[in-house]
């Protein structure tokens, strides 16, 4: 991808997702007119954040760096309190903005801080992980974790823009790229089967941050999410399809105290959801098996502890999709045909889990 590509997210108001390389000038353009900007970044991105700060300063913007903890450990209320304190100290006003720089967790917590500071200030997401690019940065869902579960405290707050700089992929560890692929695979199964065809044609090319396949996979995954979000911004119905595989995934993450990568948990969750659909008579055997084959080809896990189901069931009952104690899952009625399964029999859940159980 030699020229930047823009995907428009048609919410109200709409915003651009700009995909390309060397997007510092685009960031300055998006932030034009702001007097102050707070750059929220993870510790490993201090140097990058300083480059951004200096670039914005050259454009006459008073930019400040705020370092936040890495990964899910940063998605906690004390971290948000610290951010609020610094925003107050630097005097960030309603016509100013926040920039999030980092992975999915940084995007989530920065978005929540932006949604709550002065009842909402603009935020521009600059995701630096594959997961952040195709999932957390697009759609306006923000959140933090509590003892009650993952992302149960949050707000809908659409960004002013998202800048996906593909050059950052080249410095990512391979396992970060592998983990992010789970969300791309999800997009393929729920809406864009071409994604699956591209991965199956050459899984290693799909994982190559210097090649041409991964940028196109990112673009397609962003388009899927943008279209769903535009149709259902506040997750009243259609947007729930983006949670395909996530009910079990969030339960696994909670059981693992958020030490598992989100993408790894989603991978297991996708296979579980496929088996649940198959055993419920809604998904054909070949498509269910295709889940497992594609995920394995990318190096993602497809099994989890055999004895964990009771704990996972308890965690799933706390999922935000649950209604009056009734579990609700997103399943497929065919390739690209997501639907809902409500209140499945415990024996069906146990049978589906047996397909991902690791002894």
From Swiss-Prot:
Binding site for Zn(2+): 183, 246, 262
Signal peptide: none
Entry's EC annotation: 4.2.3.4
Pfam families hit by this protein: DHQ_synthase, DHQS_C
Pathway it works in: Metabolic intermediate biosynthesis; chorismate biosynthesis; chorismate from D-erythrose 4-phosphate and phosphoenolpyruvate: step 2/7
Class in the EC hierarchy, top level: lyase
Location of the protein in the cell: Cytoplasm
Keywords: Amino-acid biosynthesis, Aromatic amino acid biosynthesis, Cobalt, Cytoplasm, Lyase, Metal-binding, NAD, Nucleotide-binding, Zinc
GO CC terms, sorted: cytoplasm
InterPro entries registered for this protein in UniProt: Dehydroquinate_synthase, DHQ_synth_AroB, DHQ_synth_fam, DHQS/DOIS_N, DHQS_C
SUPFAM superfamilies: Dehydroquinate synthase-like
Catalytic activity: 7-phospho-2-dehydro-3-deoxy-D-arabino-heptonate = 3-dehydroquinate + phosphate
Cofactor field: Co(2+); Zn(2+); NAD(+)
GO MF annotation: an example: 3-dehydroquinate synthase activity
Gene Ontology biological process: amino acid biosynthetic process; aromatic amino acid family biosynthetic process; chorismate biosynthetic process
Co-factor binding comment: Binds 1 divalent metal cation per subunit. Can use either Co(2+) or Zn(2+).
Protein's job: Catalyzes the conversion of 3-deoxy-D-arabino-heptulosonate 7-phosphate (DAHP) to dehydroquinate (DHQ).
Similarity comment text for this entry: Belongs to the sugar phosphate cyclases superfamily. Dehydroquinate synthase family.
PANTHER family given in the database record: 3-DEHYDROQUINATE SYNTHASE, 3-DEHYDROQUINATE SYNTHASE, CHLOROPLASTIC
HAMAP family listed in its UniProt record: DHQ_synthase
Record's protein name: 3-dehydroquinate synthase
Gene (UniProt): aroB
């Amino acid at each position: 991808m030699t020229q930047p590509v823009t995907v428009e997210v048609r919410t109200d108001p709409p915003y651009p997702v700009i995909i390309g390389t060397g997007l510092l000038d685009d960031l300055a353009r998006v932030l034009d007119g702001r007097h102050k900007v707070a750059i929220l970044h993870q510790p490993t991105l201090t140097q990058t954040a300083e480059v951004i700060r200096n670039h914005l300063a050259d454009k006459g913007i008073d930019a400040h760096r705020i370092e936040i903890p890495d990964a899910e450990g940063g998605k906690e209320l004390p971290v948000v309190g610290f951010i609020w304190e610094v925003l107050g100290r630097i005097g960030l006003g309603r016509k100013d903005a926040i920039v999030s720089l980092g992975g999915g967790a940084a995007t989530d917590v920065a978005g929540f801080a932006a949604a709550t500071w002065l009842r909402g200030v603009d935020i521009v997401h600059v995701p630096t992980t594959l997961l952040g690019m195709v999932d957390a940065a697009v759609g306006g869902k923000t959140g933090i974790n509590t003892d009650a579960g993952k992302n149960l405290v949050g707000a809908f707050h659409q960004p002013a823009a998202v800048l996906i700089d593909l050059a950052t992929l080249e410095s990512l560890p391979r396992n970060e790229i592998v983990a992010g692929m789970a969300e791309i695979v999800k997009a393929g199964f729920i809406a864009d089967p071409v994604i699956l065809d591209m991965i199956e044609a050459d899984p290693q090319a799909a994982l190559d941050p210097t090649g041409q396949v991964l940028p196109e996979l990112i673009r397609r995954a962003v388009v899927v999410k943008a279209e769903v979000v535009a149709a259902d911004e506040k997750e009243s119905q259609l947007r729930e399809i983006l949670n395909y595989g996530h009910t079990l995934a969030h339960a696994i993450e909670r059981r693992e105290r958020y030490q598992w990568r989100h993408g790894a948990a989603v991978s297991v969750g996708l296979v579980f959801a496929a088996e649940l659909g198959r055993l419920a008579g809604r998904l054909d055997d070949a498509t269910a098996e295709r889940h497992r084959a594609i995920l394995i080809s990318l190096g993602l896990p497809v099994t989890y502890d055999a004895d964990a189901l009771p704990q996972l069931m308890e965690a799933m009952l706390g999922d935000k999709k649950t209604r009056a104690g009734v579990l609700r899952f997103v399943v497929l009625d065919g390739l690209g045909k997501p639907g809902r399964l409500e209140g499945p029999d415990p024996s069906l859940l146990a049978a589906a889990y047996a397909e991902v159980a690791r002894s």
